[in-house]
């Protein structure tokens, strides 16, 4: 009879322990149920980028003086600047300016050291294409005004705050 009573006590202790573990699991589950979802439904929801985000480079053709500082400070000598010297006015005339975003590392040196501020970073980060040659942007593509995520009414924007 003693074995039967000790077996019953052991069984009841194991049952209480199992119920406690299940209760702990439920409390963890319920504490996570009140949180906002971490997953962002990408094409329909986008994160608002920070002020210092390094996206696509915007180029203003009229401000550029073809000094080639951007080429000298670039760690991979990426910007291609074509110019000709106008002898009558003794100034460089910019002919073509292009950047290949397939190679660009978005370090921001060209923007930081540009004396005329003709280069700036935008918040655009969707540069993917099926053909890598489409990532070579000339002055016309670089001069296109940046598309703001906030202005698109079809997309729900999400502000993420880091602690």
Curated annotation (Swiss-Prot):
Cofactor(s) this protein requires: [4Fe-4S] cluster
**EC category name:** translocase
Question: What are the protein's UniProt keywords?
Answer: 4Fe-4S, Chloroplast, Iron, Iron-sulfur, Membrane, Metal-binding, NAD, NADP, Plastid, Plastoquinone, Quinone, Repeat, Thylakoid, Translocase
**Reaction(s) the record says it catalyses:** a plastoquinone + NADH + (n+1) H(+)(in) = a plastoquinol + NAD(+) + n H(+)(out); a plastoquinone + NADPH + (n+1) H(+)(in) = a plastoquinol + NADP(+) + n H(+)(out)
Q: Where are the transmembrane segments?
A: none
Q: Which GO terms describe its molecular function?
A: 4 iron, 4 sulfur cluster binding; iron ion binding; NADH dehydrogenase (ubiquinone) activity; quinone binding
Q: Which residues bind [4Fe-4S] cluster 2?
A: 74, 104, 107, 110
Pfam name, any one = Fer4_7
Signal peptide segment: none
Reading the lineage from the top rank, the first entry is Eukaryota
Extract the InterPro entries matched here. Answer: 4Fe4S_Fe-S-bd, 4Fe4S_Fe_S_CS, NADH_quinone_OxRdtase_chainI, NDHI
Example of a GO cellular component annotation carried by this entry: chloroplast thylakoid membrane
Question: Which positions bind [4Fe-4S] cluster 1?
Answer: 64, 67, 70, 114
EC numbers on record: 7.1.1.-
Where's the 4Fe-4S ferredoxin-type domain? 55-84, 95-124
GO terms under biological process: photosynthesis, light reaction
> What does the entry comment about cofactor binding?
Binds 2 [4Fe-4S] clusters per subunit.
Membrane-protein topology: Peripheral membrane protein
Family as reported in the entry's similarity comment: Belongs to the complex I 23 kDa subunit family.
What does this protein's UniProt record list under function? Answer: NDH shuttles electrons from NAD(P)H:plastoquinone, via FMN and iron-sulfur (Fe-S) centers, to quinones in the photosynthetic chain and possibly in a chloroplast respiratory chain. The immediate electron acceptor for the enzyme in this species is believed to be plastoquinone. Couples the redox reaction to proton translocation, and thus conserves the redox energy in a proton gradient.
Quaternary arrangement and interactors, per the entry?
NDH is composed of at least 16 different subunits, 5 of which are encoded in the nucleus.
The protein here is known as NAD(P)H-quinone oxidoreductase subunit I, chloroplastic
Origin organism of this chain? Glycine max (Soybean)
Q: What is the lineage of its organism?
A: Eukaryota, Viridiplantae, Streptophyta, Embryophyta, Tracheophyta
């Amino acid at each position: 009879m003693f074995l039967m009573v000790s077996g019953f006590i052991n069984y009841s202790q194991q049952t209480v322990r199992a119920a406690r573990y299940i209760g702990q699991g439920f409390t963890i589950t319920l504490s996570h149920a009140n949180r906002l979802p971490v997953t962002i439904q990408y094409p329909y929801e986008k994160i608002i980028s920070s002020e210092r985000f390094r996206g696509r480079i915007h180029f203003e053709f009229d401000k550029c003086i073809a000094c080639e500082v951007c080429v000298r400070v670039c760690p991979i000598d990426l910007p291609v600047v074509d110019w000709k010297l106008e002898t009558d006015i003794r100034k460089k005339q910019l002919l073509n300016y292009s950047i290949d975003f397939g190679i660009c590392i978005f370090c921001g040196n060209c923007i930081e050291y540009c004396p005329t501020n003709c280069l700036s970073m935008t918040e655009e980060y969707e540069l993917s294409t099926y053909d890598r040659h489409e990532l070579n942007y000339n002055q016309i593509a670089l001069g296109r005004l940046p598309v703001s995520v906030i202005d698109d009414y079809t997309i729900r924007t999400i502000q993420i705050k880091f602690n």
